Structures are given as C-alpha cells and as structure tokens.
Amino acid sequence: MKKLKIATMVTGHFTTPPPKGTIYAPMDIAVAVSEGLVKKGYKVDFYGPEGTNVKVTNIVSAGLKALNQPEGEAITKGQNVGNAEVNKIFNLWDQYLIAKMFTEAEKGNYDLLHIHPPDRALPLAFSHPKIPVFYTLHDPIYPWKTKIFSMFASPNQYYISISDAQRKPAPDLNYAATIYNGIDLDAFPFSESHDDYLLFIGRLQPEKGLAEAVQIARMTSEKLLIIGPQVTGEYWDKKIAPYLNDKIRYIGFVPREKLFKYYQKAKATLVPIQWEEPFGLVLTESMACGTPVIAFNRGSVPEIVIDGKTGFIIKDNKLKKMADAVKKIDEINRADCRKHVEQNFSIQRMIDRYEEVFLKIVS
C-alpha cells in the first residue's frame, strides 16, 4: 500500500490548538486526521503559523506570525484597521500558507493537499490542475459558496462532506465522500447512571437554540446547566440572563477535555437547533458518555441520532413535544447510546475513511 505524502491546513491566522476560550471544531478534526494518518505511516506536514503544536512529522510555518500572538495583534489592531480589513488580513494569512503548499506540491513533495478553508484555496487549486486537492466542508453551503465553487470547479478538486444533509444546497459538487466527524472515545467515557439535570453545550447564539433550551427547562421544571463561551448583547440580556437562577445555571466555558464530567451525569442533552447544522459534535460526545440527546429535526440530526433508541428527534420542532420527550427520557438505554457512537463515530473510523478515500482517488 502506497504511503502518501500529505500537506494539510486549517488556518494561517491563529495557532493550533486555538486560543484559550475558542471553540473551533474544524481544528480538532484536522488534528485528529493528521495525527491518525501519521500513526499509520503516512508523511503529513501540518501548515500553521508559528506556535502551532501538532504531533505530526513536521510543522510548516514559513515564518508566519499568528494574529492571536502579540506581534500579529499589532497588525489587526493597528490604525485604520476595521472589521473588513481584519477579514482581508485573515484571508491573506491563510493564502500565504496555501500558496506555500502548492509550491511544494509542484516540486513533487506532496501527493495531495487537504485543506479545510476551501474558498481561500479555490483559485490556486483551479490554476494547478495536476495537484489533487481535498476540501473538508465544515460549514453550511450558502448560495454564494455554491456560486464560487462552480466558478473554480476543476477535476482535481474533491469535496468531503461531513453529512449527507450538508450536500443538499449543492448536490452536484465533485464529492469524494461523506465522512462523519469522529471523536476520541477515551475522552468521553461512558456512565451508566446520571444525575438530575439537563445539559446545553455550545456557542451561546440564537442558531444553537439556547433560548429554546431555557424554555424547555422552565416548562418541565428541570434543572439546566449551560456551558459555552461567555457572550454579551441583546440575545443574552433579554432571552437568557433574566431566567438564570438556582435551577437554570450558566457554568461558563469548559475546556473540551473536561466536558465529559458534565455529559456523563446529565439525564439528557438538549439540542433545539435553529439552523441546518452540518454536523453536531455535541450529539456524538453526549451519546458516547451514555447521555441521550433530544434534538430538533434540523441538518444532520437524523443521520446521527436514532429516534427512540439514542434519544428523541422532534420532527416538527415544537417546544411542547421536546418537553414531552424530556419526561420519557429514561426509556432510552444509555448503553445503546454508547454503542452507536462506538460503531459509527469514533476517531479511528473517521481516520480509516479518510485513508480509504485518499488512496482510492490518488493511488
């Protein structure tokens, strides 16, 4: 079996791991895939700014300073730098490293490139038709992205979706496969028993459904723990903060390596999402710990949760029906939740799928 030489990248503007308090799932996935392929004997170069720390054979920074470090912050916080300019700077930092990847690939140093911000790499991939480029799509495919992907389409560019639902806005892209995000099962150990609280974990934003989770807790008189990076603004001030009390508690940001303690003892994790989420790691993390999920029927939810076996899917997205599901959550066998993740959403299964797809197309 050929051992491929691979270059991969997520972002050039901040380091891997991300800054403290930052949740950025694509980075976790990229690191897991890279480290897993190295363990299988592949050569993987991970591109990122100085300070990037990943257990791969080589980190390539090409002298680039991270924008979340003092030297980089001086650029983004300089005179006449507004939000639009900051985004341009981010893009150029990414493109600097992407250009380096293509230069090395042209020299024959890589068999393929695996890039996680596809829109920033498209022009270079389009102009280098002999270099195989794989993109993992982490975000929804918005109409403007569909247009751009079409503009720069070429046979050497392959898209990896993280759910079948993610493909719906752009079914005709050159998809290599759907590969579900995997999690480290050792980091999310199983608990057969639970305490008496519901759980919400994620960004504290409207699309994640925090306000709906709060209302479910009030409707059912259940205790709710809320975990996520602190936010400010009208949404928090009007829809969340007024309801915080001894039963509805905001815990704050919890590092990913400590989340299992909260998942394990929850009676259920609430996921009343308000958007077509391509893949929800909260779903798999919760079930790995044995905790069933109660979720609205949006995005990838029906691909991840088995309705009636590993949780409940609220098909018409009604709060009352979610509240009713809370009352029957003990019908779910927690061991079934764990088994489902072991069989379908482990890191090892994800790594094996990437290896399979890369070898099938490039070899």
Predicted regions, residues:
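Conserved donor-binding/catalytic core segment of Leloir-type glycosyltransferases
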Residues: 160, 173-227
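Nucleotide-activated donor-binding/catalytic signature segment of Leloir-type glycosyltransferases, i.e.
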Residues: 228, 237-257
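Acidic donor-binding loop of glycosyltransferase active sites
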Residues: 264-278, 291
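Short hydrophobic beta-strand element within catalytic cores of glycosyltransferases
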Residues: 292-295, 305
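A short, well-ordered alpha-helix in the C-terminal region of glycosyltransferases
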Residues: 321, 328-356, 360
